[in-house]
Amino acid sequence: MYKLIEGDDSKANEEEVTGDPWTILPVKTRKYAKECIEIVLSKRHITKLVKFNDFENLEALWLTNNNLTEIKGLETNFRIKILCLGFNRISSLEGSSLNVMKFLETLYLNNNKLKNLDKVITYLSQFKFLKSLNLFGNPVAEEPEYRPRVVDTLKSLEIFDRHMVTTIERIKAEKIVKEFNDPLSKKHVKRPKRLKVYENFSLIEKNLFNEANQIL
C-alpha cells in the first residue's frame, strides 16, 4: 500500500482549481492507484475534486487549506476513514460525498462556514464509527450549548474539537440538552416587556402587575 503526500503549492488561483490525485502519482498505473491508501493535497487552492474513482482503497485524505465549497467527487471512496477538510469554505454537508463513507472515524471540518448546528449534528449522527470530530471555527460553534449538543447527539465521539469526551461530560451534556430543549425552561421563556403605561398605574394596580410578572 502506498501513501502519497503533496502540497504547499505557492501559486494562488481564483479560478477553478481541480484536485486530481493522478497528478502526484509517481507511477501512473491503475494498480498503483488501487493500492494507494493515503493522499495529501493540502494548500493547493483546490476548488473541485476530480478523478478519485480509481482510488478505491483510499483510507485517508488530507485536503486542508484549500478553497472547497462542497464535498463532492468522492462518491466511490467508501473506505475512507480519515477525512481532513479544515480551512476550506464548506457551508453544507447535505448531499455530499460523505454519504458513502460509512466507516468514517475521523472528520476535521474546522474553520469552514457550516451553519445550523441541528442540521449538522443530525447529518453526522449517521456515522456510527466516528471517533474524532472538529467543527471549531464554524458559525455553528457560536450557537448556544454548542459542545453539549454535539456530545449528547454523537454517542461514538471520543475526541471533539481536540478535547477528550469523558463519561462525566456526557452525563452533564445530557442534562444540559434536556433543559435546552425544554420549552418550559425558564432560561428560554421570554418575559413580556413592561408596558409603558405602568407608571400611570395606581398603587394597587402596580402591586397586581408585579404579582402577575412573578407568576410568569
What label would you give each PLM region?
Residues 1-62, 67, 75, 79-84, ...:
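Long, contiguous C-terminal flanking segments immediately downstream of a protein's structured core
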